[in-house]
Structure formats: structure tokens, C-alpha cells
Swiss-Prot record:
Residues 1-144 are annotated as: Editing domain. Belongs to the class-II aminoacyl-tRNA synthetase family. HAMAP family: Thr_tRNA_synth (MF_00184). The keyword Iron-sulfur does not apply. It comes from Methanosarcina barkeri (strain Fusaro / DSM 804). GO terms for cellular component: cytoplasm. It comes from the Archaea. Zn(2+) binds at residues 307, 359, 483. This is Threonine--tRNA ligase. Catalyzes the attachment of threonine to tRNA(Thr) in a two-step reaction: L-threonine is first activated by ATP to form Thr-AMP and then transferred to the acceptor end of tRNA(Thr). Also edits incorrectly charged L-seryl-tRNA(Thr). The N-terminal domain is an archaea-specific tRNA-editing domain that hydrolyzes incorrectly charged L-seryl-tRNA(Thr). Catalysis of tRNA editing is performed by the charged tRNA itself.
Length: 635
């Protein structure tokens, strides 16, 4: 079932001509107008033939949920075959439409446009954030293959109960302001906050499908950072030397920050027994699709987070209350999630990714809340130092109603800290293992959002994994657990930096990466061969990643290529520089698109400037030949 829901000022139709599959209708149904209504455009698909009753039930649930959100008691059901290219038989379609009509009629004023007729229609969409929503509904236990329903012919995809619950969980969306107001979205003016508007639309629509490649895909290839690997599964990438360098620097940085925060680095397996009693329960509480493989007649799954290994390790440890909060971190290279193929694109959404995963065992909820606050601030600092600032992302806070009532000040302070409105999702009932979580979400050039940093308060897994600590009285107690990824997936950080640069380019700014992450920090461009020796001397005075463009190209082309590679500092060496010992430097961060900023300084002054910019950050050597003439092309 494909469903398009439009909250409308009015919807009206008039039948014109019947098709060979048209249902017989009374004269009164040949035209209709319904005002202040939720219009449900629907296409019943071949996959729905396997279980029409389930399709009816799920569709009714979705329509009722949206009708409640937009506060209407009028519904127009409108068959609309153009929503799908894989339609069910007319007989099944009519059965489903009538079933939905019957199920809704007890609570709503329902009108149904006739099936199989050509119709003229007019509709006026209200235009608020909830006024246009789409849903894709499928009965369980079916597979789509070559446009047909194939029952039991393909290996069943492993989908957790939590992922199923995520599709049906009833939640309330609100905007929380820095002064503590919790506002309904329809009653909050999002106009001054265009990125928040895009994020709200993205979250509520739940549409993750890729319509076109975002700008970072072209950039990751042109900058020779990463690329698709056709020899692997979709969503598994190859990283060229420059991309691997950036990944390694980000990994090292996040690990350093976590270690300074008090976390112990560990390493755990990437696969686990799907039938392990404890792990099986957790699988059903985590909203993710898994890769599964068979090994020695056991069904295994590839981890989608470090939780499994760290919690099993916690179970075997002897922990005192004096050790709390106890923190462990792992840089998972890799974690695996069987994301749907149509959602995969570039570095935004992958099936194999690198995730810094930190868990904290806390003495009780009070200590967990205290740690949550500190880790919220930690995540802000981590992204800031990566080059992703508060203005660059939108905050989502998700919690149960009970937790909110008991911890309003904590939640309001989160909005106050970032000093801007945030999106809130609240559940009446807890469907998942957490009672509170937040994410920092980057909204890209195509208005698609991706979660970066996150922290969650987990109230289930200490019990599930039998994790305990010895309290001050010598008795065993269960800790409260925090899950934290200080940066989010490393690949997503690169994606966000590239997308941010692309958007800044559209605004007339000069794109670049932070200096500490730039593969080449200084490029020396000798004007001719006779200047190469002095270029070598200058390079020896710079404690950074420096290369020399010694190719037989014009000076103009060398400088342009350095610009296309986003090199932060470009040094041109000619006769003047050899004579007076200074260097001509173009500073990218201070340049405009048609007005480069150039200064004449000494190599020592340039070195001091760069050392100041990269102070406190990890460092790695240049991953390629120092001389551009010795480098291969990867793309």
C-alpha cells in the first residue's frame, strides 16, 4: 500500500468516465465535496494480496494517527493508481478500500471516491508541516522481487521487533523553545528557522528514499576521498589515501576526547550468535536491520553497534560503586546495518560504517542524568572541534511522557544550551529500551537529515545482560546505562563537512575542510624548475603536511588545482622569494571566491600559524608522495 495524506481545506471530485474495472456506484457517489478533511490518496499493491486484512489494519492505523495530529474528523479515501507501478488486482483493491472505509466510519465522517473511474478533482492543501505526508505499508512475511510477491523464496530479512514498533509507535511531535515552551508544530512559526523546518518535514514524513545524489558524492570523488565499491555490497565504500587519512584523524580525535573524559578503550567481536538468549532479546529492542551469516551451523549476525560486546564484558566484570560512572569506548570498524537499498547514498547512509560507541554504567538515575548533561556538552564540543557548529545542525529530543514530567528542567536546558528551538518526539508508552535520547541532526543540501552525536538513557540492558555492581553495603545492584556516540558515525562527519562546504559555496564562500583535517595543509608551487630546490628548503621548515607541485604545468594551472583540492595554504616560489627569504602565501580561509587573500611572510611565521590552528588535534603524516609528479590518480 502506498499512501499520500493531504490535510486539505477542501477536496472535491466528479466522475467522468468509467474504466473496464470500474465498480458500480449510486448516482450520489458520482461527485462529492468534503471540507476541512484529511485526504488519503491510496494505491493497493500486489504485495498486499498476501494479507489484505493486515493492510487494512495498518492503513487505518496510519490514517487515524495523522487525523489525530491534524485534528480533523473528516476523511476522504481516494484511489490513486499513479502512486505505484505494481498494483494489486482490482478485486483486492476494492476489498481493501471498502475495508478501510468500514473501519474508519465509526469514528469519522468518511467519504470514498469510487474505484476504476476517471475523475476530475480539486484539492487545496493547507501547507503546514503535517499537511503532506507519505507512507509505504507492507504486510509482514512478504518479499518484493521483480515487482511480484514471492513467499518464502528468499532468505527472510532479519528485522527487529523494535524496528516494527518504530513504524507503528504513536508519538507526538512538538517544538521546544529555549524558554521552555512546548508548542504544537502547527502553532509554531518555523519561517525564521528554515533548516528546522526541513528537519521537521523529514522526520514526520519518514521518507528516506534517495531521489538524487547529494553534492558530497561528487566532492568525495573529486577530492579523491572515497568512492563506491562495485565489487562489494551496496553501502560498503572504498577509501583512498586522503579519505583514509581524514577518517583516521577523526577516529583518533574522538578516542582521545573519550579517553580524557574517562573512558577505557576496548575491542570486541564483530559477529554474535543470533540465538544467544540475552542477545536475541536485545536484537528485538534495537531498531535496526541486521546482516546474518551462518557459521558452524549457527546463525550469526554482524553487530550494528558495540553494545553487545561491551555489555557481555560488563557482565563478566567485578564492579564496585567506587568505579562508577564506569565508561568504555570502542571505535567499531565496522558496524553493519542492512539499510534499505533505496536509502543508500554516498557517505550519508551506509551498510558498513565506523562508529565511536561509548557506554557508561551509572549508580542510579540521578548519576545517569548528571552524566547525560555532561555528555550532551561533550558532544557539542566534539562537533565544534570537527568543524560542525551548533548553527549547522538541528537537535531532536525524544522521551517518554513520564520521564518528561519528572525531568522538565533537564530537557528544557538542552534547548537553552543550544539557544534555538528543537524538535521533540514524545511517546505515551515506552516502546524501546531508552527513556530519553537526543541526536544532533545535520540537514544537507537536499533537505535530508542525518543523525550525528547521540546520547541515550537505557533502563533495560543492565537487567537483560545481568550487569551489576557492589554498592556501599556490599550488595549487588543494577546500574543505569548510557549509550553515547560523541560524533556519530565517522563517515557521516565527513559527509556533513562536505555538504556544509557545498552549501557555503552556493552562498558565495570559499569551501574548505578544517586545517587539521586537510590532507595537504600547505602546497608549495615553484614557478619553474629552478625554484624547486628552494621549495624543498621551505618544506623542511614546516611541521605539517606539505607537498610540492613539481609537475611541468603552468603556474596558473597549478594554483587552480590547489584551489580545487581545497588546500588551506598555497605558497608560490619565484625569484623574489629566493632573494629575500619570504614566501607568497594564499590563505584560503580568508579568501573570497574571486578575491584570494595573499600575504608575504616568512616560512617560520607560516609554521607558527599552522601549529596554532592544529594545536590539540591528532596529526598524521602526508599519506602520498610529497611530490605531485610521483602520485597516481585514483579517480
Amino acid at each position: 500500500m502506498q499512501l499520500l495524506l493531504i490535510h486539505s481545506d477542501y477536496i472535491e471530485y466528479e466522475t467522468k468516465k468509467q474504466t473496464p474495472v470500474a465498480e458500480k456506484i449510486e448516482e450520489s457517489l458520482k461527485s462529492c465535496r468534503l471540507e476541512e478533511a484529511l485526504t488519503a490518496f491510496m494505491a493497493v499493491e500486489s504485495v498486499d494480496e498476501a494479507n489484505p486484512e493486515e493492510t487494512i489494519e495498518k492503513t487505518v492505523f496510519e490514517i487515524e494517527k495523522v487525523a489525530t495530529q491534524v485534528k480533523t474528523d473528516r476523511i476522504m479515501l481516494y484511489p490513486y493508481a499513479h502512486l505505484s507501478s505494481d498494483l494489486s488486482s482490482p478485486k483486492v483493491a476494492v476489498k481493501v478500500f471498502k475495508g478501510i472505509e468500514t473501519a474508519l466510519s465509526g469514528k469519522y465522517e468518511v467519504k470514498r471516491a469510487p474505484f476504476g473511474w476517471y475523475k476530475a478533482f480539486s484539492i487545496s492543501c493547507k501547507g503546514h508541516p503535517l499537511s503532506e505526508l507519505s507512507r509505504s505499508i507492507r504486510p509482514e512475511g512478504t518479499q518484493r522481487a521483480a515487482g511480484k510477491v514471492e513467499a518464502g523464496k528468499e532468505k527472510e530479512e532479519v528485522v527487529s521487533e523494535a524496528l516494527k514498533a518504530e513504524d507503528t509507535a504513536k508519538s507526538y511531535w512538538r517544538i521546544l523553545t529555549p524558554d521552555g515552551e512546548l508548542r504544537e508544530i502547527e502553532n509554531f512559526d518555523l519561517t525564521p528557522y528554515p533548516k528546522l523546518q526541513q528537519f521537521v518535514d523529514y522526520e514526520i514524513s519518514k521518507s528516506r528514499a534517495v531521489e538524487r545524489a547529494p553534492p558530497h558524492v561528487e566532492l568525495m570523488r573529486r577530492l579523491e576521498l572515497a568512492d563506491y565499491e562495485p565489487g562489494s555490497d551496496s553501502g560498503n565504500m572504498r577509501y583512498y589515501p586522503k579519505g583514509r587519512l581524514i577518517k583516521a584523524l577523526l577516529e583518533n580525535y574522538v578516542l582521545d576526547v573519550a579517553t580524557d573524559f574517562g573512558a577505557m578503550e576496548v575491542e570486541t567481536p564483530i559477529m554474535y550468535d543470533m540465538n544467544h538468549p540475552t542477545l536475541k532479546k536485545y536484537l528485538d529492542r534495537f531498531p535496526a536491520r541486521q546482516y546474518s551469516i551462518e557459521s558452524d551451523k549457527r546463525q550469526m549476525f554482524l553487530r550494528f553497534a558495540a553494545c553487545f560486546g561491551q555489555f557481555l564484558m560488563n557482565h563478566d566484570m567485578t564492579i564496585s560503586y567506587r568505579n562508577l560512572p564506569l565508561r568504555m569506548i570502542e571505535m567499531t570498524r565496522y558496524s553493519f546495518r542492512k539499510e534499505q537499498r533505496g536509502e543508500l547514498v554516498g557517505l550519508r547512509r551506509l551498510r558498513a560504517f565506523t562508529m565511536p560507541d561509548m557506554h557508561s554504567l551509572c549508580e542510579d538515575m540521578d548519576q545517569a542524568v548528571d552524566q547525560f548533561k555532561k555528555q550532551y556538552d561533550l558532544c557539542i564540543d566534539v562537533l565544534e572541534n570537527i568543524g560542525i557548529h551548533i548553527k549547522d545542525y538541528e537537535v531532536a529530543i525524544r522521551f517518554t511522557k513520564d520521564f518528561y514530567e519528572s525531568n522538565k528542567e533537564l530537557i528544557v536546558n538542552m534547548a537553552r544550551t543550544v539557544n534555538k528551538p528543537v524538535l521533540v518526539e514524545m511517546w505515551d508508552t515506552r516502546f524501546f529500551y531508552f527513556v530519553l535520547k537526543f541526536e544532533f541532526n545535520f540537514v544537507d543540501a537536499l533537505a535530508k537529515a542525518s543523525a550525528l552525536s547521540t546520547v541515550q538513557i537505557d533502563v533495560e540492558n543492565a537487567e537483560r545482560y545481568d550487569i551489576s555492581y557492589v554498592n556501599a553495603d556490599g550488595k549487588l545492584e543494577r546500574p543505569t546505562v548510557l549509550h553515547c556516540s560523541p560524533s556519530g558515525a565517522i563517515e557521516r562527519c565527513i559527509y556533513a563537512l562536505l555538504e556544509k562546504a557545498a552549501m557555503e559555496t552556493e552562498e558565495g564562500k570559499v569551501p574548505m575542510l578544517p586545517v587539521w583535517l586537510s590532507p595537504t595543509q600547505v602546497r608549495i608551487v615553484p614557478i619553474s624548475e629552478k625554484h624547486v630546490a628552494f621549495a624543498e628548503e621551505v618544506s623542511q621548515k614546516l611541521d605539517c603536511r606539505v607537498d610540492i607541485d613539481d609537475r611541468d604545468l603552468s603556474i596558473g594551472k597549478k594554483v587552480r588545482e590547489a584551489g580545487r583540492e581545497w588546500v588551506p595554504y598555497v605558497v608560490v616560489i619565484g625569484d623574489k622569494e629566493i632573494e629575500d627569504g619570504t614566501i607568497n602565501v594564499t590563505i584560503r580561509a580568508e579568501s573570497e571566491q574571486k578575491k584570494p587573500k595573499k600575504v608575504q611572510i616568512t616560512p617560520e611565521e607560516l609554521n607558527d600559524r599552522i601549529k596554532g590552528e592544529i594545536a590539540g588535534k591528532p596529526y598524521r603524516k602526508l599519506p602520498l608522495s610529497k611530490h605531485l609528479s610521483g602520485r597516481p590518480k585514483f579517480v
